[in-house]
């Protein structure tokens, strides 16, 4: 399993991820990985991925989906998993090694500019594309990773109204605190930046994709082992 890295000039959003969010995400890995498995399971059942395929996993995070994809494509296939956070990638490498997976490569890079080879059958992202600083640049470069006939699937959050696990805590907080100012640091456009289907359709079309299809997924979400854990998680990562 290769551990080569791609060095990029980090944007302020990448800096925010590495300096602010990585320690929090690491602390609550049991929620951010375990709590999202139902979304992946519903999608993975129908992914057009088989033995021998070459796959990219964009914004791979802790690497759990990359490892699942590596098992799916088997020893004759390969997975290129890319993320901007070294700490996340280290978890992926360690977990892959522990599970005997050697057909996945974890790379540090900016998906918007990474020099993908146009040789992949499939490109996947779970809750990664919504944080692109330039969505069209990121989506276009994901398409550049695909060979003719390749397919891209991404999972993104719908509107906050459809996600009370974040929406309700935000409403409560705003009863007592003002919203963040314009100069507040952030991780980028945010988790709900791709909630508008019409807008995302245009982004995909501009990026060169053909006949985009949207599917609504409703799945349970674990937000903590117990009430105290859920509250601590929201205070750390929520509104």
Question: What is each stretch, according to the model?
Answer:
Residues 112-123:
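A short acidic, Gly/Pro-enriched loop at the edge of an enzyme's catalytic core
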Residues 74, 132-133, 146-148:
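Helix-to-beta-strand junctions that scaffold the AdoMet/dcAdoMet cofactor pocket
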Residues 34-53, 68:
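Conserved alpha-helix/loop element of class I SAM-dependent methyltransferases that forms part
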Residues 44, 67-70, 93, 136-143, ...:
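A structural alpha-helix within SAM-dependent methyltransferase catalytic domains
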Residues 54-114, 137:
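Class I SAM-dependent methyltransferase SAM/SAH-binding core
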Residues 2-31, 213-239:
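C-terminal helical/coil "lid" or tail adjacent to the Rossmann-like core of SAM-dependent
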Residues 121-136, 158:
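A short SAM/SAH-binding and catalytic strip from SAM-dependent methyltransferases
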Residues 136, 147-225:
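Conserved catalytic/acceptor-binding region of the Class I
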